[in-house]
Design a protein with these regions (language model features):
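Conserved catalytic-core segment of clan PA serine endopeptidases
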Residues: 2-22, 36, 62-123
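Solvent-exposed loop/turn segments at secondary-structure junctions
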Residues: 24-25, 39-41, 49-52, 70-73, ...
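Terminal peptide-recognition signature
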Residues: 32, 45, 65, 103, ...
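Chymotrypsin/trypsin-fold serine protease catalytic domain
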Residues: 96-100, 106-186
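C-terminal cap/linker of serine protease catalytic domains
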Residues: 123, 215, 224-258
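Catalytic nucleophile loop of clan PA
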Residues: 190-217
Length: 258
């Protein structure tokens, strides 16, 4: 199966930025990924890129996905979130083993004239969608795709957050202090945290198709060797409970907002 490619032909448009307003009433963003489903309308991201964990429980404001984002461009339009499914354990007690979300978005829109929005169709029809793997042994390697922007602990800024970055690394079981999770997974990756949260971990990914299987989502980063540079991403393990959340979201239709 051939997936669509970004205008520059080098990065998969299934990845993009998720923009929202936080409890501080300021704009923020994460990374999100279009996933294949019946209604072709789902974005996968970290749970805390959907639910406000800094204030009383509730969804973040003005949530929108921009697939294929690059240096301010919106090549495939804007996809506004309509509804989402998260695990009750993350919503209720902030269990980061369940820090994932599947968001149903309306059809994409573009501004065709001042104050006029034009419907450009369903998300996965326009950019394709990644598959999903769960209940699998740890993959030997995964490709991590995201928009890192923040600093390393030493203050260096290796990324701008304006273009999609890709790293390939080995996965491993890990323990993370300060993060309420019992069985997080690590991947060797130099991504910094800010902006890369929500990044996709893809198995069997090929550059030619831009497609693979989603098998992890970055919820944190870690400096495992203490050199003041992040060298690992952290994800929940994708098990049957994650698949149940995905299945619930996959059955929800959205339609047009234009």
């Amino acid at each position: 199966m051939e997936g669509p490619v970004s205008p520059d032909g080098s990065t998969p448009p299934t990845s993009g930025k998720v923009f929202f307003i936080g409890s501080d009433l300021q704009p923020h963003w994460c990374t999100g990924t279009a996933v294949q489903t019946r209604y072709r309308n789902i974005v996968a991201t970290a749970g805390h890129c959907l639910l406000d964990t800094e204030a009383p429980a509730g969804p973040l404001f003005k949530w929108v996905f921009v697939p294929g984002y690059s240096e301010g461009t919106t090549p495939f339009g804007l996809y506004v979130g309509k509804q989402a499914v998260v695990h009750y354990a993350f919503d209720d007690v902030r269990d980061h083993d369940r820090d994932y979300a599947f968001v149903n978005v309306y059809n994409g829109v573009v501004s065709s004239a001042p104050d006029v929005l034009t419907n450009v169709g369903r998300l996965a029809d326009n950019v394709g969608g990644q598959g999903l793997e769960f209940n699998q042994p740890l993959a030997p390697t995964v490709d991590v795709l995201g928009y890192p922007a923040g600093p390393n602990p030493d203050g260096s800024l290796p990324y701008t957050g304006e273009t999609l970055e890709r790293s390939t690394g080995s996965t491993f079981a890990m323990k993370v202090t300060g993060l309420p999770a019992d069985r997080p997974i690590g991947v060797d990756s130099p991504f910094t945290g800010e902006g890369s949260l929500g990044s996709s971990w893809l198995t069997h990914y090929t550059s030619d198709s831009g497609l693979g299987y989603l098998n992890g989502i970055t919820i944190s980063v870690s400096d495992t060797d203490g050199d003041d540079r992040y060298d690992a991403g952290v994800s929940p393990y994708f098990d049957g409970e994650l698949y149940a959340i995905y299945r619930s979201a996959a059955g929800l239709w959205t339609g047009s907002i234009a």
